[in-house]
Amino acid sequence: MGFYEGDDNDANTKAFNDKYIKDQKFATAPFWNLFPKLRDIDEYDNPLLPLPFNFNFRDLGDSALAMASGIPTVKQFDKCEELKGQSAWTTQGIWKCLVPSKAIPPLPQLDFLLPLEEIKSDKSHSHGLFFNDFNLFLKWRSHMNRLQKQRIKTRTTAVEPLARTPEDLMLNWDDLHLGNDAEYASADGSKKIVGRAQSISTTKDSNDAKPSTVKTEKIYFDDGTVDITTTTTSKGSSPQVKHKVVSVDEDN
């Protein structure tokens, strides 16, 4: 169904979230997209929660601020009640009224009205993700904030200057390129890769003339974990491999 049910591991929800992040909608949504087109607003309509000043929403035209808080106006809510609709919120926190088919036809041409059955049957979220509880919307926003921070951290790690020695220069951009890792899953398919990072450094022990090369590979997953593999090699010795899984907060 087109509703978010609080499970970020649901296959359809994960696919929607991955595409949402990859398309950068979460980070770059235009400011005015936060507000709906309130074509039915007039000077007699008021916000459901009172404002500490007089305000005529009609003065703002088609892109009114009335819905910035995700709360309908009195007129909108009354219309929704009249049509036996139910409240829902979009991924941008915009309030909508989902109206059952018995109220159709004709469904009034108002921007905040949507057909309930069409949204409920939209399993692939082609019409977007909807929330029938504002707390679920806040939970989803929190989850998406973590994913966005994780991706930003991954990209920052990837583009940091890594070259320190001639050996380091062997690392090329292809090794660091993140591409569309959100489309790829872990080996067991339980979680998706959202980014990669790799670094190579050369160290030299003061008590040993032999330099050691340390290669660190990191894979970032959508559940907030990081798979870290460190391979240390030195001339005349077998490679030493260390592997661990940590949270993105523990990743230095």
UniProtKB/Swiss-Prot annotation:
Cellular compartments annotated: Mitochondrion membrane
Protein's UniProt keywords contain Aminoacyl-tRNA synthetase: no
Superkingdom as given in the UniProt entry: Eukaryota
Keywords assigned by UniProt, alphabetized: Membrane, Mitochondrion
UniProt-listed InterPro entries: Mpm1
Pfam families, sorted: MPM1 (PF17234)
Disordered as annotated region, ranges: 230-252
Membrane topology, from the record: Peripheral membrane protein
Cellular component GO terms held in the UniProt record: mitochondrial membrane
Name of the featured protein: Mitochondrial peculiar membrane protein 1
